[in-house]
A protein has these predicted regions:
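Class I S-adenosyl-L-methionine-dependent methyltransferase catalytic core
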Residues: 1-172
């Protein structure tokens, strides 16, 4: 029997990971977001945001500079596809996602992105004020920042990965 600690290494028990504030702040200084497309009332990062009840997948994003930290479960591919398609309509979409380079959605959609920033180490997700015992836990997976700029799609893979560390987010 695999103990609970090992289970987390192979599969997370949750699919919503609250964006670390310093990561959002650093990206927001660079992009000036106008819409958080995957949010809840308690963790929205922008004044304008979509909750699960709003169903961001069914909304238009094309007039916005979008921040997206989607649910990390099986539906993530639909969110990455939506980000790509909305960029073709004029949206700029910055995605914080798990770096699952072995998945179909990664090869089909992420590789069409304008930029992929692979985060060194593991991000510490969540609101640190709400963590048990005042500590946050590192994610059981590596993360990436994927950027879809408003442009015409190409038929070839165009993303060139760069590397950033969580410490770099704290410097800005």
């Amino acid at each position: 029997m695999i103990n609970d600690r090992l289970k987390v290494m192979f599969k997370s028990l949750k699919d919503d990971w609250e964006t670390p504030q310093e990561v959002f702040d650093s990206l927001n200084r660079e992009f000036e977001f106008t819409l958080d497309v995957c949010s809840s009332d308690h963790n929205a990062k922008c004044t304008k945001y979509f909750t699960p009840e709003d169903d961001g997948l069914s909304k238009d994003w094309f007039n916005d500079v979008c921040f997206m930290n989607p649910p990390y479960g099986r539906v993530i591919g639909k969110w990455i596809e939506k980000a790509h398609k909305e960029s073709l309509k004029g949206a700029l979409v910055v995605c914080l996602i798990p770096a699952r380079t072995d998945t179909i959605w990664w090869h089909k959609w992420v590789m069409l992105a304008d930029e992929v920033r692979l985060v060194k180490g593991r991000l510490k997700f969540g609101n640190r004020k709400n963590m048990k015992f005042g500590k946050s836990n590192s994610a059981p997976f590596p993360s990436a920042i994927v950027i879809f700029k408003h442009k015409v799609a190409t038929d070839f893979t165009s993303a060139t990965p760069t590397f950033v560390s969580q410490k770099e987010f704290n410097r800005n």
